[in-house]
Amino acid sequence: DEVIVLEASSEEGEALNLVNEIQELAWNRGFEYKDIAVLYRANFQSRVLEESFSQHKIPYRIENGLGFYNRPEVKKLLDYLRVISDPNSDAGDEALLSILNVPTRYIGRKVITQLEEEAASKGVHLYEALKSFRPDTPFIRKNVRELVAFLEPLTQLAHTLQPAEVINLLRNNLDYDRYVTDEDIPTPDDSKIQNLNQLQLAATRF
């Protein structure tokens, strides 16, 4: 077959072109989805493709990599959003455990167990217990206080702030870009930074 070149004015348009081509192959030309491969230049570009494929119920599998929303730097920011939007829930508990040490706060397994036990004894969720939690070690206690002081205003404003605004606040106030890249001055072409930019761009739609 001849090579076909399609132009698109946006990432979304490019993804829709791909969806149309895949549907044509699968519906009208006798191909199965497993016969079709999509190549892209950089990992951050998968976000729009994954969302478009999901919306159009096209099954896909990413070879030798993680789906966009499962990449660690993306997943941890989403966990922060879950804590902020719904702190006192089972989902909030799971998300809080995920971000306690993001960035590093040296909160070890023993301290986490103490927090879980305190929450259970009070019959509350982990975030509620965290607000009055007093670890024995002064340094850890200070880190816990700072985390609560950071999260609490955001939980109060969760329904007034836009998701993209919250992501921007998290990235700036936690120095998150430097944390995930382990670089003093993260560069825009770093794949993790590109993933975070894609997440923030996606969040502007909500």
Where are the regions that the model predicts?
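Helicase P-loop NTPase motor core
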Residues: 1-59, 82-90, 155, 160
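General small-molecule cofactor/ligand-binding pocket signal
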Residues: 6, 61-63, 177
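Conserved short internal alpha-helix adjacent to the catalytic or cofactor-binding core
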Residues: 2, 55-61, 66-103
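Short, amphipathic alpha-helical segments that act as regulatory/interfacial helices
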Residues: 23, 43, 50, 54, ...
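Accessory C-terminal helicase-associated subdomains
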Residues: 86-92, 96, 103, 129-206
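Helical mechanochemical/support elements of P-loop NTPase systems and associated helical scaffolds
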Residues: 11-14, 18, 32, 42-45, ...
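A short beta-strand-loop micro-motif that forms or neighbors metal/cofactor-
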Residues: 119-132
